[in-house]
C-alpha cells in the first residue's frame, strides 16, 4: 500500500493510459481554445493550457467549484494564460453560479470570429451541459471523463462509456472523447 512506502522505496507505475487532448490543427482561421475545469477536473488541464499557449493559441480558462476553498490550480493556469475566470456555486469567489453560466457570459463578451475549440474536465453533469452548449454553437468539444478505472488496461470493463459507435473503454479509448461522440445518460 502506498501509504506504507518510505522515501527511496521503489514502486511500479502503469501509465499514462488511453489518449489525451488533440491540439488545434493549423487552419486559415485563428483558433482559440476555451478550457473549462470543474472541481478536481482542473488538475489535468494545466499542462494543456501551457501547451496551447506555447503554440500561440489564444487560450481562455474557466474554473468552477462549489466554494472558494475548493478552487484548484488558479495560479498555475495564470502562469500559462492571462485570461483566467473563476465561478463558485455559492458566490464566495469570482462569478456566482455554475461554470456553465460563466461560459455563456464569456461567449457573449468575446469575439466570435475565432474557430473555437473547447476542452473540459469535471463532473458528468457539467460535461453534459458544456457539451450541449458547444453542440448548439457548433464548437468542437473534447471532454476528459472522470471514470473509475479499476484495471487500467481494459480487462475489467469497469470504465465502459457509451458512444455512437458502440461501447468504448475510458482507460483505453479515452479518457478524452469528442463530446459529440458520446451518448449522455
Q: What kind of feature is each model-predicted range?
A:
Residues 44-53:
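Histidine-anchored nucleotide/phosphate-binding helix
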Residues 1-34:
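FAD-binding FR-type
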Residues 33-42:
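Short, glycine-rich nucleotide/cofactor-binding loops
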Residues 10, 32, 57-61, 83, ...:
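Residues at the starts of beta-strands that form the adenosine-phosphate
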Residues 23-33, 54-56, 105-117:
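Intrinsic disorder/low-complexity segments
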Residues 66-110, 114-185:
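Reductase modules of NAD(P)H-dependent flavoproteins
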Residues 14, 36-37, 62-64, 121, ...:
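Short beta-strand segments
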Residues 38, 48, 147:
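Extended, positively charged loop/linker patches that create polyanion-binding surfaces
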Amino acid at each position: 500500500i502506498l501509504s506504507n512506502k518510505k522515501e527511496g522505496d521503489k514502486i511500479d507505475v502503469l501509465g499514462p493510459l488511453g489518449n489525451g487532448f488533440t491540439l488545434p490543427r493549423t487552419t486559415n482561421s485563428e483558433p482559440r481554445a476555451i478550457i473549462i475545469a470543474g472541481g478536481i477536473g482542473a488538475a489535468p488541464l494545466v499542462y494543456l493550457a501551457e501547451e496551447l499557449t506555447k503554440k500561440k493559441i489564444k487560450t481562455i480558462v474557466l474554473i468552477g467549484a462549489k466554494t472558494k476553498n475548493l478552487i484548484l490550480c488558479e495560479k498555475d493556469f495564470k502562469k500559462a494564460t492571462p485570461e483566467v475566470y473563476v465561478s463558485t456555486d455559492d458566490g464566495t469567489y469570482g462569478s456566482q453560479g455554475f461554470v456553465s453560466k460563466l461560459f455563456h457570459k464569456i461567449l457573449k463578451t468575446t469575439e466570435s470570429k475565432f474557430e473555437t475549440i473547447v476542452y473540459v474536465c469535471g463532473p458528468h453533469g457539467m460535461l453534459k451541459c458544456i457539451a450541449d452548449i458547444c453542440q448548439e454553437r457548433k464548437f468542437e468539444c473534447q471532454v476528459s471523463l472522470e471514470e473509475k478505472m479499476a484495471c487500467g488496461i481494459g480487462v475489467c470493463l469497469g470504465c465502459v462509456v457509451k458512444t455512437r459507435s458502440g461501447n468504448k473503454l475510458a482507460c483505453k479509448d479515452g479518457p478524452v472523447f469528442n463530446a459529440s461522440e458520446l451518448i449522455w445518460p
